[in-house]
Structures are given as structure tokens and as C-alpha cells.
């Protein structure tokens, strides 16, 4: 008895893809095992447009595909995300400066992020506060938040840091009433 008579060809171990068959495949079987694109299925009978389809298959136009509403939203509004860290807080936050209209909105957002660490009291009483908000500009210099106009701050800010006053002395950054515009926005 031969193997074909017993039906053992299904359980036979081969190198290759399952269902690919042996070496005695015909051209019809080889074409059957290849994957087909939707355009191949749609236009199987029309051979006149075959050359044009082969050229368009090789082109990858918009990959990865992005929804049109997402394209519109990302093009119109640039995002200005900045990392915010606070001394004593075990986590960092990211804040979008483009969403805020001024220092008062930023102060309110920081109060929401770090309210449990007493940032509200620190921002209200800048002269006696335990914490001082500072930022790093494009040049790598640390400056007090509120020293420059809001638009200049938005353009130059790379990251924000709320540090302890004792550490800010090392940077030679001490608030002298310069945070009044920043502090007025903190609401309770």
C-alpha cells in the first residue's frame, strides 16, 4: 500500500506553509496559494487596465492613514507641551501652554496638578512661600515665571519646575513682587 492510499499526506511533516502541497504543484495551485489584493478580485475579468493597476499598487500614498478631522485639528493648533516637575512630588506632569491665555490660567492649572503639595499657598504669598516657580528657556537659562510677557514665555519655555526656595537661592532666583501677575490667577 502506498501513502496516498492511506490518507497520510495530511499528517506528513513538510518544510513550507500549510496547504502549499508538494513539488508537483501546477501553476493553477501556485496562483491559488498567493494572496490577492481587492483590486485583483474586482478586476479579474478586465485585462485592459492591468498595467495601470500594477503601477498604482506599488505606490504608498498616505501611510499610516489619518482621519481627515484629525489632520485639520493638528495642522491648525500647534501644541506646546512642557514638562512640569515639583520638588517633593514623585511624578512629572505635562501641560499644554497653548491652552492657557496667561499666567493666571497657568497658575490655576498648576494648582489643580499639585494642589495637595501646597502650591496654592506658595503661589499666593510669593515673598514667604516655600516654593518658587521657575522655567528653563531655549538657551538653557533658568528664570522666574512671570518675569517676561506671556507670549515670550510661551515661545521660550522648555520646561517648568516648582522648586524649594532654599534651592532657588543657588540659582540666584528670588521673587521680589515679580510673581504678582502669576499669583492673582490662583483661585480657591
Swiss-Prot record:
GO terms for cellular component: nucleus. The N-terminal half of the protein contains two conserved domains I and II. Domain I includes a slightly degenerated ERF-associated amphiphilic repression (EAR) motif which seems to be involved in the activity of transcriptional repression. Domain II is required for the correct degradation of the protein through the SCF-mediated ubiquitin-proteasome pathway. Interactions between Aux/IAA proteins and auxin response factors (ARFs) occur through their C-terminal dimerization domains III and IV. Residues 16-57 are annotated as: Disordered. GO terms for biological process: auxin-activated signaling pathway; regulation of DNA-templated transcription. It comes from the Eukaryota. A motif (EAR-like (transcriptional repression)) lies at residues 13-17. Keywords: Auxin signaling pathway, Nucleus, Repressor, Transcription, Transcription regulation. Induction: By auxin. Homodimers and heterodimers. Belongs to the Aux/IAA family. Signal peptide: none annotated. InterPro entries: AUX/IAA_dom, AUX_IAA, PB1-like. Aux/IAA proteins are short-lived transcriptional factors that function as repressors of early auxin response genes at low auxin concentrations. Repression is thought to result from the interaction with auxin response factors (ARFs), proteins that bind to the auxin-responsive promoter element (AuxRE). Formation of heterodimers with ARF proteins may alter their ability to modulate early auxin response genes expression. Transmembrane segments: none annotated. Residues 79-167 form the PB1 domain. It holds the Pfam family AUX_IAA. It is found in: Nucleus. It comes from Vigna radiata var. radiata. This is Auxin-induced protein 22C.
